[in-house]
Curated annotation (Swiss-Prot):
Modification Hypusine occurs at: K37
SMART domains to which the protein is assigned, alphabetical: eIF-5a
GO biological process: positive regulation of translational elongation; positive regulation of translational termination
Any one GO cellular component localisation term in the record: cytoplasm
This protein's name: Translation initiation factor 5A
Localization terms from the record: Cytoplasm
Length: 131
């Protein structure tokens, strides 16, 4: 599963995922403001990229649409550690994937079970489940 779906900007909450400038991001802060008597409400959003640690800001009308990435969370088993890459076998489809080694997840070793997700044709290991 990959790609995006449209969502309502005014309904986005902290912790959800959005696409800003083609980058899948996790929303860290939102603020709604109504500028005046005849103006429409605006939403200011601060988000951090899922795959790159880049901070993004977005401001738009509360009634507008924003892309929401389709995220597929899965479990896999680590087959091999190859430098800055990790080879994983998906536990459902048994396909093998090469995913970049995450800097913020500890305990990744051969044979460990991990949780990873796919968003917009990219993969990331989120945590180690067991060994």
């Amino acid at each position: 599963m990959a790609g995006t779906k449209p969502g309502d900007l005014g309904q986005v909450k902290v912790g959800q995922y959005v696409v800003i400038d083609g980058i899948a991001c996790r929303v860290m802060d939102t603020a709604h403001s109504k500028p005046g008597k005849h103006g429409g409400a605006k939403v200011r959003m601060v988000a951090v990229g899922i795959f790159e640690p880049v901070k993004k800001e977005y401001v738009g009308p509360a009634g507008s649409r924003i892309d929401i990435p389709l995220i597929d969370k899965r479990k896999g088993q680590v087959l091999a550690l190859m430098g800055d890459q990790v080879q994983i076998m998906d536990m459902e489809s048994f396909e093998t994937l090469e995913i970049p080694m995450p800097e913020d997840v500890e305990g990744i070793e051969s044979g460990a079970e991990v949780e990873y997700f796919e968003a917009m044709d990219r993969y990331k290991i989120t945590r180690v489940i067991g060994k």
